[in-house]
């Protein structure tokens, strides 16, 4: 009995990027191994996959064509100019289909960001993988296809549809965060150029404003005077007495390298101070800062005697002690959602901005569009309603809405300023009154807010500059938006949840460190689940849906540890996937939900 082959669906969207203006279709891609990468530029897991794909693009050259299918979550991501900026910002060096209506997403039955689909040179789907961490599996599939279709004569290894746009000439390119230095200068992470820039003034358009550069500007990892970074973001100034002891003044969140770097301002020397360079996959128990794996550190702040790290890649805050040389989790469980409480129990979703104010630490949680506060060992949400609710609404904090904020700062009057990135605004929260207002709007993806020289300075990332905007407090009601996707009908009461997983060929489950399976279940709203929430070690679980809740989103995080079965020195692998499954609770709905974790 032969297995039927599935013809790949056509690529349909609003337009194309990185093709020199040409529209692509599968007929033009015939003869190539094609990998469709369904992504959205807000999603940290999608950004991880972009970096997993880079070595495959280099290895297989023109025999392989990666096609990014951009299927957006937030309203801002539907803007074609915002997508074009993101493609440049993150160094996407392959064609990208703009799929704002999720047409191609639906045609391939994608259910999660990111999803990868492999198409053979004859136009048939051969593999689908959801989530990140599939580089080795992709390498094996692509290698087999290249070998087999070379033998068949159906592989075209020459020519590429990718056409690079010429680089723009600006003093900064997609700056991320800024830091006021003693003496009045500003230090800025020039993220898309993989370097730090020291500015003598706020407007860097004039060459005279650039007082110095740290880093060669090449994407990479190198210490010393000729340092290299990889899309650096956050900056934190150490207290003078700490800096003297450790030999560096500033801690840098070197995001894509999964490192923290130390910078000595006197001569620009860079040192790696935390991280191995490998992306965090599971807790190894290590405490020495240079022995622990990090995951996309996005911001850093000095608070309570240490550097707090917004570990966006695993939805946690970490604590780095530069004197002791230790690092580890400080808040969060790695579950991506919104839950308050003691620091060890809270849930976050891509924390991306930090600001200390005495005994309080403020943070913005990008994927829940939330402003949150840490105080007295607990975290509470001030603004934000969950993973799928966002907008631009001022008023009482409980009713206010933001859209994917990336930066936060404390104003001289004690209020909190938020870089409300996808709304293009600076928002103000007054802890005394509990009110949220808009200070400035019409900005191009503001990513940080600081106070320097008595002025509020905004990193206007997509405009490639720093600005000190005129701040005119106003109330805005831009509406409430909710992410909508295809929904699954489930029956009330007990529901059987099953995660299907089979180790890849040549691998087996790895029991070396306990159970190789971990499954965490939560819901938005939390009231959707009467029982069955939390972490467990089984792939099958009975959960119970609460009476009186019409629906919501079931959030499932599953991971499986495997190792090579026969190798003398077996490599270890961790497969992880997050699902957000929108459900409606109806009488005739399904009583079982099955999700596939692909290795």
Residue ranges, per PLM feature:
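Short, internal strand/loop/helix patches
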Residues: 84-119
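Extracellular/lumen-exposed scaffold segments
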Residues: 404, 471-599
């Amino acid at each position: 009995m032969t297995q039927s082959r599935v013809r790949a669906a056509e690529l349909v969207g609003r337009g194309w990027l990185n093709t020199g203006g040409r529209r692509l279709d599968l007929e033009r891609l015939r003869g190539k191994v094609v990998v469709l990468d369904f992504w959205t530029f807000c999603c940290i897991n999608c950004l991880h996959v972009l970096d997993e794909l880079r070595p495959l693009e280099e290895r297989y050259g023109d025999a392989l064509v990666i096609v990014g299918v951009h299927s957006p979550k937030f309203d801002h991501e539907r803007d074609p100019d915002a997508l074009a900026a993101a493609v440049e910002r993150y160094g996407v060096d392959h064609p990208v289909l703009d799929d704002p209506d999720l047409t191609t997403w639906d045609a391939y039955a994608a259910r999660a960001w990111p999803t990868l689909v492999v198409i053979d040179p004859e136009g048939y789907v051969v593999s689908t993988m959801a989530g990140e961490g599939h580089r080795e599996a992709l390498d094996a599939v692509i290698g087999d296809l290249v070998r087999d279709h070379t033998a068949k004569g159906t592989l075209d290894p020459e020519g590429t549809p990718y056409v690079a746009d010429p680089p723009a000439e600006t003093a900064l390119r997609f700056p991320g965060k800024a830091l006021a230095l003693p003496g009045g200068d500003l230090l800025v992470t020039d993220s898309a150029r993989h370097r730090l820039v020291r500015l003598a003034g706020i407007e860097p358009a004039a060459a005279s404003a650039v007082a110095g550069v740290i880093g060669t500007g090449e994407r990479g990892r190198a210490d010393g005077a000729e340092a290299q970074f990889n899309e650096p973001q956050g900056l934190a100034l150490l207290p003078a007495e700490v800096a003297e002891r450790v030999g560096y003044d500033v801690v840098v969140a070197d995001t894509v390298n999964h490192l923290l770097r130390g910078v000595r301002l006197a001569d620009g020397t860079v040192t790696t101070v935390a991280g191995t360079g490998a992306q965090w996959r599971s807790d190894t128990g290590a405490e020495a800062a240079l022995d622990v794996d990090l995951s996309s550190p996005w911001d850093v702040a000095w608070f309570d005697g240490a550097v707090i790290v917004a570990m966006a890649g695993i939805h946690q805050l970490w604590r780095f002690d530069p004197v002791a040389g230790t690092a580890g989790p400080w808040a969060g469980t790695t579950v991506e959602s919104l839950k308050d409480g003691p620091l060890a129990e809270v849930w976050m979703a891509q924390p991306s901005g930090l600001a200390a104010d005495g005994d309080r630490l403020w943070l913005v949680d990008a994927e829940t569009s939330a402003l949150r506060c840490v105080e007295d060992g607990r975290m509470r949400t001030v603004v934000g309603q969950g993973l799928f609710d966002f907008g631009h609404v001022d008023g009482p904090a409980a009713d206010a809405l933001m859209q994917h904020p990336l930066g936060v700062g404390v104003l001289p009057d004690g209020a909190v300023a938020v870089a409300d990135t996808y709304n293009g605004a600076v928002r103000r929260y007054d802890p005394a009154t509990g009110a949220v207002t808009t200070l400035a709007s019409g900005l191009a993806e503001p990513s940080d807010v600081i106070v320097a020289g008595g002025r509020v300075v905004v990193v206007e990332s997509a405009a490639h500059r720093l600005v000190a905007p005129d701040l005119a407090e106003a109330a805005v009601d831009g509406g409430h938006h909710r992410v909508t996707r295809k929904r699954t009908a489930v029956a009330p009461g007990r529901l059987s949840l099953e995660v299907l997983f089979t180790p890849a060929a040549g691998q087996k489950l790895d029991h070396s460190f306990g159970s190789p399976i971990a499954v965490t279940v939560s819901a938005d709203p939390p009231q959707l689940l009467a029982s069955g929430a939390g972490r467990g070690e089984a792939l099958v679980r009975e959960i119970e849906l609460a009476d009186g809740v019409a629906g919501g989103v079931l959030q499932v995080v599953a991971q499986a540890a495997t190792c090579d079965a026969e190798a003398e020195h077996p490599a270890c692998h961790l497969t992880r996937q997050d699902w957000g499954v929108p459900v409606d609770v109806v009488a005739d709905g399904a009583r079982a939900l099955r999700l596939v974790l692909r290795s």
